[in-house]
């Protein structure tokens, strides 16, 4: 009886062992592909999509030129918030003068005088930058600067030479730091002083 029970137990255990050893009808390992870890996948896509940081020399040169032009134009606004015109008659004269500055020979002559004086400022980086511009661009920039100075010198109530000279004193600290603006301001003075003398 004991032998029978023992042999039955051994047979049962052998069956279980055979079931564990025998292959199961599951998907084979060869057809299984493990998913790529998320971190690795992100790094791979980023490395393929990120553009190169190195820009061609021509792009860098163009951006530097744009910065220089922007710096020059920004200087025009430094004196733009000093006041507004109150005298209507004087304002009309100023607008006529500025129109001539852009459209008539007066502006061409004034720009040429400024250019000649800028040539003497060899040590000035800003002067050399202006002189390297194309003639048309240079003329427009000088005319804009002349207009700003005319409006600055004749702003508000300015109906006599004392007031006119007072405007000059107010911007002296700025002019001492910028030789180019001094040259342009002096030409603007010559262009606009007759508006005061005529009154």
From Swiss-Prot:
One Pfam entry name: Paramyxo_C
A GO BP annotation: symbiont-mediated suppression of host type I interferon-mediated signaling pathway
Residue spans of biased composition, Low complexity class: 58-67
Residue pairs linked by disulfide bridges in the UniProt entry: none
Key word Membrane present: no
Region (Disordered), start-end ranges: 19-67
Biased composition (Polar residues): 19-34, 43-57
Coiled coil: none
Entry-linked InterPro entries: Paramyxo_C
UniProt entry keywords in alphabetical sequence: Host-virus interaction, Inhibition of host innate immune response by virus, Inhibition of host interferon signaling pathway by virus, Inhibition of host STAT1 by virus, Inhibition of host STAT2 by virus, Interferon antiviral system evasion, Viral immunoevasion
UniProt record similarity statement: Belongs to the respirovirus protein C family.
Protein name according to UniProt: Protein C
Biological source species: Human parainfluenza 3 virus (strain Wash/47885/57)
Gene that this sequence comes from: P/V/C
């Amino acid at each position: 009886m004991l032998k029978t029970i023992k042999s039955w137990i051994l047979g049962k255990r052998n069956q279980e062992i055979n079931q564990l050893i025998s292959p199961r009808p599951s998907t084979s390992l060869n057809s299984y592909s493990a998913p790529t870890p998320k971190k690795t996948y992100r790094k791979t896509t980023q490395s393929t999509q990120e553009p190169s940081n190195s820009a061609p020399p021509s792009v860098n040169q163009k951006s530097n030129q744009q910065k220089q032009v922007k710096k020059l134009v920004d200087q025009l606004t430094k004196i733009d918030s000093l006041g507004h015109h109150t005298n209507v008659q004087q304002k009309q004269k100023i607008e006529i003068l500025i129109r001539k500055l852009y459209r008539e020979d007066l502006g061409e002559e004034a720009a040429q005088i400024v250019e000649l004086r800028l040539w003497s400022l060899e040590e000035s980086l800003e002067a050399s930058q202006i002189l390297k511009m194309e003639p048309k661009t240079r003329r427009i920039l000088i005319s804009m600067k002349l207009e700003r100075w005319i409006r600055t010198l004749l702003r508000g109530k300015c109906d006599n030479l004392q007031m006119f000279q007072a405007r000059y004193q107010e911007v002296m600290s700025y002019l001492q730091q910028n030789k180019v603006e001094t040259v342009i301001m002096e030409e603007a003075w010559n262009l606009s002083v007759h508006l005061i003398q005529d009154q």
